[in-house]
Design a protein with these regions (language model features):
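Primarily recognizes the serine-hydrolase "nucleophile elbow" in alpha/beta-hydrolase
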Residues: 103-107, 114-168
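Short, surface-exposed "cap/lid" segments of acyl-processing enzymes
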Residues: 8-63
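Alpha/beta-hydrolase active-site loop
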Residues: 87-107
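Catalytic histidine neighborhood in serine/cysteine hydrolases
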Residues: 284-302
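Short alpha-helix in the alpha/beta-hydrolase fold that links the catalytic acid
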Residues: 272-282
Length: 334
């Protein structure tokens, strides 16, 4: 938790922004709290391989603090603690952010009804959006004012297809490891499909940060990891237990109880613009208050992740301004 020295110049109590971090990895050393000075660190993983942990959003934490907002950053379940990080498990990510909000407000001796918002991009966007969905049922005492979610992976099977063969294809191993830890049926259904190289893929994922993954497993086609030569997406389609596990995490099924800004670049090469737009439309159809932004971005080399990463730095400042406006005035007018 970061407590600002700058005064809050808006109305009422100092607000709090809970950040869901973007993909850091699955190894314990990848946790946001493990980054040196909360910025980044280089070292060795549990298995002795070089590893790097970078806080992509650090400048945005500072931006929020300069505005006088309190900042809380959640490690998410399994990062820096026993067990696999349950990557893109939206239900657990929602609980992690909401619990972090509760704990942070208590630690700061802030009123339980102090204004609160969520922010994140990519994995963090999904975590923030899921927290917005579950706030009313899981933490109704919290005064959630709004959420900013950039490039959230709202449809996991669709995201799997676009990630496969990309620079960050190893993150599929993070997801499989996490879901396998929660469901023996899922674990058995998946593991019987992998060849020895596929098993190495999963074992390596368990101790890797995302930079390590790009260097060691970047652009891996999952057809090279399975016994049958099928892609993971093809296996998902023929194995109901796997598909149902992933579909259970899809977002857009329940309306957030506060305004949400969603942003996605039409050129995003990892998390499709269409899935984010569809989810925004689903919320609108349920009566949600949604601002959807077709974010500016780049169109460079497909599947490298560049066109996914650039909008983070273009749109997060807009999202933070949106949250600060929600704290101080009528969001619809602003």
């Amino acid at each position: 938790m970061y407590e600002p020295t700058a005064p809050w110049r808006g109305k009422g109590e100092r607000p709090t922004i809970v950040f869901g971090p973007s993909t850091r990895g699955q190894g314990d050393q990848c946790a946001p709290s493990r980054a040196g000075m909360q910025v980044g660190s280089v070292g060795l993983s549990k298995v002795g391989s070089p590893t790097i942990n970078v806080s992509y959003e650090y400048s945005f934490y500072m931006m929020a603090l300069r505005r006088g907002a309190r900042v809380i950053v959640a490690d998410l379940i399994g990062l820096g603690m026993p067990g696999h990080h349950t990557y893109v498990n939206h239900i657990e990510e929602a609980h992690a952010l909401l619990d972090a909000a509760r704990s942070g407000l208590s630690l700061a001796h802030a009123p339980a009804d102090a204004p609160l918002g969520f922010a994140g991009y990519s994995q963090g966007g999904g975590a923030s959006l899921s927290a917005a969905e579950y706030a009313e049922s899981y933490a109704p005492e919290l005064n959630v004012v709004g959420t900013y979610a950039g490039a959230p992976p709202t449809d996991l099977p669709e995201t799997m297809r676009s990630i496969d063969g990309s620079a960050i294809s190893h993150v599929l191993g993070y997801a499989i490891n996490g879901f396998a830890e929660r469901s023996p049926e899922f674990r058995d259904a998946v593991l019987e499909e992998f060849n020895p190289r596929g098993i190495d893929f999963l074992r390596s994922a368990a101790t890797s940060c995302v930079g390590d993954s790009v260097l060691t497993w970047g652009f891996t086609d999952t057809r090279r990891l399975t016994r049958t030569g099928e892609s993971l997406s093809e296996i998902v389609e023929r194995k109901p237990v796997i598909k149902e596990t992933l579909m259970r995490q899809n977002l857009g099924k329940q309306v957030p109880n506060a305004p949400v800004m969603m942003a996605s670049s039409p050129h995003d090469d990892l998390i499709s613009h269409d899935q984010v737009r569809r989810t925004a439309g689903a919320y609108c159809s349920m009566g949600g208050t949604i601002d959807f932004i077709a974010a500016p971005g780049t169109s460079t080399i497909p599947r490298t992740g560049v066109d996914h990463a650039v909008p983070l730095y273009l749109e997060m400042p807009v999202g933070l301004r949106y949250l600060c406006l929600l704290y101080t005035s009528d969001a619809a007018d602003e």
